[in-house]
């Protein structure tokens, strides 16, 4: 796992077309903004896991 440090307002670039910007930090919460092409899905981990579980349930 690559670990990077960013301050509010700073951005990470992934590949040629995805950027992640730190929008704010309040207590133990970090607000981030993600810019990605529409064909790339972006989900919180718990939502992604729910989607995967539903897909497995539908194929059974």
Swiss-Prot record:
Keywords: Activator, Cytoplasm, Repressor, RNA-binding, Translation regulation. One of its GO terms (cellular component) is cytosol. It is found in: Cytoplasm. Its main location: cytoplasm. InterPro entries: CsrA, CsrA_sf. GO terms for molecular function: mRNA 5'-UTR binding. GO terms for biological process: mRNA catabolic process; negative regulation of translational initiation; positive regulation of translational initiation; regulation of carbohydrate metabolic process. The keyword Repeat does not apply. SUPFAM superfamilies: CsrA-like (SSF117130). Belongs to the CsrA/RsmA family. A key translational regulator that binds mRNA to regulate translation initiation and/or mRNA stability. Mediates global changes in gene expression, shifting from rapid growth to stress survival by linking envelope stress, the stringent response and the catabolite repression systems. Usually binds in the 5'-UTR; binding at or near the Shine-Dalgarno sequence prevents ribosome-binding, repressing translation, binding elsewhere in the 5'-UTR can activate translation and/or stabilize the mRNA. Its function is antagonized by small RNA(s). Homodimer; the beta-strands of each monomer intercalate to form a hydrophobic core, while the alpha-helices form wings that extend away from the core. This is Translational regulator CsrA.
């Amino acid at each position: 796992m690559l670990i990077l440090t960013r301050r509010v307002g700073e951005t990470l670039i992934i590949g040629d077309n995805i950027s992640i910007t730190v929008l704010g930090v309040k207590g133990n919460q970090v607000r981030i903004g993600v810019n990605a092409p529409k064909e790339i899905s972006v989900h919180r981990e718990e939502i992604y896991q729910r989607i995967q579980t539903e897909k497995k349930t539908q194929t059974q």
